[in-house]
Swiss-Prot record:
Single annotated GO MF: proton-transporting ATPase activity, rotational mechanism
GO cellular component terms, A-Z: plant-type vacuole; proton-transporting V-type ATPase, V1 domain
Entry-linked InterPro entries: ATP-synt_VA_C (IPR055190), ATP-synth_a_Xtn (IPR031686), ATP_synth_asu-like_sf (IPR023366), ATPase_a/bsu_AS (IPR020003), ATPase_F1/V1/A1_a/bsu_N (IPR004100), ATPase_F1/V1/A1_a/bsu_N_sf (IPR036121), ATPase_F1/V1/A1_a/bsu_nucl-bd (IPR000194), ATPase_F1/V1_b/a_C (IPR024034)
PANTHER family: H(+)-TRANSPORTING TWO-SECTOR ATPASE, V-TYPE PROTON ATPASE CATALYTIC SUBUNIT A
Native organism: Beta vulgaris (Sugar beet)
Family according to the record: Belongs to the ATPase alpha/beta chains family.
Catalytic activity: ATP + H2O + 4 H(+)(in) = ADP + phosphate + 5 H(+)(out)
First-level EC class: translocase
Protein name listed in UniProt: V-type proton ATPase catalytic subunit A
Keywords: ATP-binding, Hydrogen ion transport, Ion transport, Nucleotide-binding, Translocase, Transport
GO biological process: ATP metabolic process
The keyword Lipid metabolism is annotated on this UniProt entry: no
UniProt-annotated binding residues for ATP: G252, A253, F254, G255, C256, G257, K258, T259
């Protein structure tokens, strides 16, 4: 029997009970309050109104529930129905995630665009996140009936594309004895490929599993991270390194190049898979990612060129999409990242931008009439940020075979007006281990990436010492010297402004010129050229070694050239006599990694030897 409220009529499906419905009492932007919600659970998914808008219960009082709705709530009226679904907001995990683009609640945007023929998402649209009709090539491991499986075990492989193998993972809460495993062949993600019997109960499993977004996926144990996240950006790899499984924050005002750095990480880092969450970003930036990524290629160790998009998943929640879904998009992204981590992959997750995520929290908190804290943000802002960054780390995965995986989180934060005392910024900096601070003045001077080497830091240098010792035992000393030169230049700049460069000591002139070499020809990098868009770590080390070698030799020559009859070797003489070598130092960045490591290292070694020989000749002549 239809239930009539006012002039609206609610019709129930045959499978639904009237008791599963509540009714709207109040609408305030994305926040809806519904009555008659006895028995509802926190974070339960509900369908709101006649358009079946997706919502999530975020507060329960008596029989009324406060719901945040992930779609535009215009047109909802009092007494509209609210249907409970008895399950939390979850994401679908299985083959087909990579190369896809979802919104904040994992609706596939490409599929919706095809079905609706519109540039906007229709309200209440319900499309399965993963294509249920695609056939995947299922290759089971060497398992048979009677074998035992436990949560987290890898029992099959699916070639998701020519770049990534998708390991089919048994859900963490499942275990039992195999009663059926599908033979190798083509199956959809809805076909039963495994049956397990445990305590007399037989459970069927497909390649698809769902997981609640607000529940972290379990792991066997956390491990200490000791492998660097190589980004291809010299300033990050050499001076402020992160690790696979680290937490990083890119901080900078608008227009400093945060998005370019996070896109460079997605394109060139040594991660196996990338989850890029555009959280409240401009739609044009997500469109740029969608246009660029499919055309970008990465060279594999065997020489094959593959599209970067094949290892990437995009979660797009642009600034004109509903605010509540922006808050959920971070959790959707992290759940997808944890799923690939459980296969034994190193995953990078880019969250762009954390500030707009915090603004979404602030808006919802305001609608709920919660007590505002600093700058109107809710008091639990720091706790929410911490729980998000806590998902990062290197872990020993559940189940067999034994494997390690990691999730690296890189969060971009744009403090208003570049003010680093902003609550979101200070809360983020108290959590993350690596801080890449972008400088507006550097960006205005067209120095990109505009990472300020005086304020940025990395707390992972100690954890990576063993890696550097194996790679190049001299690197740590060279890096320390380079940092000292850059710091000394900052101190000297004030003196130069007062008395001019000519009044400085010879060693100080050398410091200023070496710092200029480091700044303009080492730390600055042109992302739009073939030779400099990506810098392998060996090239970064050799470039820095040669610049610091020049600095050390020039200082020694000046000291030895000082005598009772005055300064025989001045810095101006060094520049005059060694102009061609100085030019070769400046030109190191133009060496193209495509020539191969051996060819480049030979060139850098030759320059190193030529510098030593030239300074020796200069000293011999002036004796």
């Amino acid at each position: 029997m239809p239930a009539v409220y006012g002039d609206r009529m609610t019709t129930f499906e045959d499978s639904e009970k009237e008791s599963e419905y509540g009714y709207i009492r109040k609408v305030s932007g994305p926040v809806v309050v519904a009555d008659g919600m006895n028995g509802a659970a926190m974070y339960e998914l509900v369908r709101v109104g006649h358009d079946n808008l997706i919502g999530e219960i975020i507060r329960l009082e008596g029989d009324s529930a406060t719901i945040q709705v992930y779609e535009e709530t215009g047109g909802l009226t009092v007494n509209d129905p609210v249907l409970r679904t008895h399950k939390p907001l979850s994401v679908e995990l299985g083959p087909g995630i990579l190369g896809n683009i979802f919104d904040g609640i994992q609706r596939p945007l490409k599929t919706i665009a095809k079905r609706s023929g519109d540039v906007y998402i229709p309200r209440g649209v319900s499309v399965p996140p993963l294509d249920k009709d695609t056939q995947w090539d299922f290759q089971p491991k060497k398992l048979g009936v009677g074998d035992l499986l436990t949560g987290g075990d890898l029992y099959a492989i699916v070639d998701e594309n020519s770049l990534m193998q998708h390991h089919v993972v048994l859900p963490p809460d499942a275990m039992g004895k195999i009663t059926y495993i599908a033979p190798a062949g083509n199956y959809t993600i809805q076909d039963t490929v495994l049956e397990l019997e445990f305590q007399g109960v037989v459970k069927k499993f497909t390649m698809l599993q769902t997981w609640p977004v607000r529940t972290p996926r379990p792991v066997a144990s956390k491990l200490a991270a000791d492998t660097p996240l190589l980004t291809g950006q010299r300033v990050l790899d050499a001076l402020f390194p992160s690790v696979l499984g680290g937490t990083c924050a890119i901080l900078g005002a608008f227009g400093c190049g945060k998005t370019v750095i996070s896109q460079a990480l997605s394109k060139y880092s040594n991660s196996d898979a990338v989850v890029y969450v555009g959280c409240g970003e401009r739609g044009n930036e997500m469109a740029e990612v969608l246009m660029d990524f499919p055309q970008l290629t990465m060279t594999l160790p065997d020489g094959r060129e593959e599209s970067v998009m094949k290892r990437t998943t995009l979660v797009a929640n642009t600034s004109n999409m509903p605010v509540a879904a922006r808050e959920a998009s971070i959790y959707t992204g992290i759940t997808i990242a944890e799923y690939f981590r459980d296969m034994g992959y190193n995953v990078s997750m880019m969250a762009d931008s954390g500030s707009r995520w915090a603004e979404a929290l602030r808006e919802i908190s305001g609608r709920l009439a919660e007590m505002p804290a600093d700058s109107g943000y809710p008091a639990y802002l720091a706790a929410r940020l911490a729980s998000f960054y806590e998902a990062a780390g290197k872990v020993k995965c559940l189940g067999g075979p034994e494997r390690n995986g990691s999730v690296t989180i890189v969060g971009a934060v744009s403090p208003p007006g570049g003010d680093f005392s902003d609550p979101v910024t200070s809360a983020t900096l108290s959590i993350v281990q690596v801080f890449w601070g972008l400088d507006k003045k550097l960006a205005q001077r067209k120095h990109f990436p505009s990472v300020n080497w005086l304020i940025s830091y990395s707390k992972y240098s100690g954890a990576l010492e063993s890696f550097y010792e194996k790679f190049d035992s001299e690197f740590i000393d060279i890096r320390t010297k380079a940092r000292e030169v850059l710091q000394r230049e900052d101190d000297l700049n004030e003196i130069v402004q007062l008395v001019g460069k000519d009044a400085l000591a010879e060693t100080d002139k050398i410091t200023l010129d070496t710092a200029k070499l480091l700044r303009e020809d080492y730390l600055a990098q042109n992302a739009f050229t073939a030779y400099d868009k990506f810098c392998p770590f060996y090239k970064s080390v050799w470039m820095m070694r040669n610049i610091i070698h020049f600095y050390n030799l020039a200082n020694q020559a000046v000291e030895r050239g000082a005598g009772s009859d005055g300064q025989k070797i001045t810095y101006s003489l060094i520049k005059l006599r060694l102009g061609d070598l100085f030019y070769r130092l400046v030109s190191q960045k133009f060496e193209d990694p495509a020539e191969g490591e051996d060819a480049l290292v030979a060139k850098f070694k030759k320059l190193n030897e030529d510098l030593t020989a030239a300074f020796r000749n200069l000293e011999d002549e002036t004796r």
